[in-house]
Regions:
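Terminal amphipathic alpha-helical/low-complexity segments used for targeting or macromolecular assembly
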Residues: 1-57, 173-192
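Flexible, glycine/small-residue-enriched loop-and-beta-strand segment within the central core
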Residues: 64-74, 79-146, 172-192
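Extended beta-solenoid/beta-helix repeat architectures
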Residues: 145-148, 163
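Acidic, glycine-centered active-site loop in nucleotide-sugar glycosyltransferases
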Residues: 164-165, 170-173
């Protein structure tokens, strides 16, 4: 994946990440129990979660889940509906006038594909959502994706590659890309 980086397990960087995740999980749990009309407390907690003040025009409906916080930036007039998940270690940049439907997942992190490396840390790459994008309910945006200005992502879509500006994309497509080898070098599925 383009721009992919890795954090190896059992390193100072991975320990700092785990500590930050634990803090943000506590903060988002508090955020999700606040009265909906307590805007000042909500805005204060969002500032703690994201490590900086958020735009006054940002609207995030609870419940909201985030794992890192420091990787997310928001433009003006952004609306994020209920039940969204932001795994933002790799960075999530959201432009102006973006609408994000309920249950959307933006995940910038994953694990190495190779079996021998899968449990030795995490990989991450940024997500960029340009101005005036609408992401429909329950869509999933994967690491390294840019969604071009003015585009629409249909409900339930899984977006694993860049979306050109002013496009409408829908659906999911699962395509076998390659076979994985086991630690012995055998190709999975070939032993039948």
């Amino acid at each position: 994946m383009v721009n992919e980086q890795r954090i190896r397990s059992r390193t100072p960087e991975s320990r700092a990440f785990v500590e930050r995740v634990q803090l943000v999980m506590t903060l988002t749990a508090r955020l999700n129990t606040l009265p909906f009309d307590d805007l000042d407390a909500r805005r204060t907690l969002l500032g703690e979660i994201f490590g900086k003040p958020v735009p006054d025009s940002l609207s995030i409906l609870p419940p909201f889940y985030c794992d890192y916080g420091l990787g997310a930036t928001f433009g003006e007039k952004v609306f994020i509906n209920q039940g969204c998940y932001f795994l933002d270690l790799g960075g999530i940049t959201i432009g102006d006038r973006v609408l994000i439907g309920p249950g959307v997942t933006l995940t910038t992190a994953g694990h190495p594909v190779e079996l021998d490396e899968r449990y030795d840390g995490i990989t991450h790459a940024p997500i960029v959502i340009e101005d005036e994008v609408w992401i429909g309910a329950a869509a999933t945006i994967t690491p390294g994706v840019t969604i071009g200005r003015g585009s629409v992502v249909g409900a339930g879509s899984v977006v694993a590659k860049d979306v050109p500006a002013m496009s409408v994309v829908t659906g999911t497509s699962v395509v076998e890309r390659r076979r994985l080898k086991t630690s012995s070098g055998a190709v999975r599925g070939s032993e039948r």
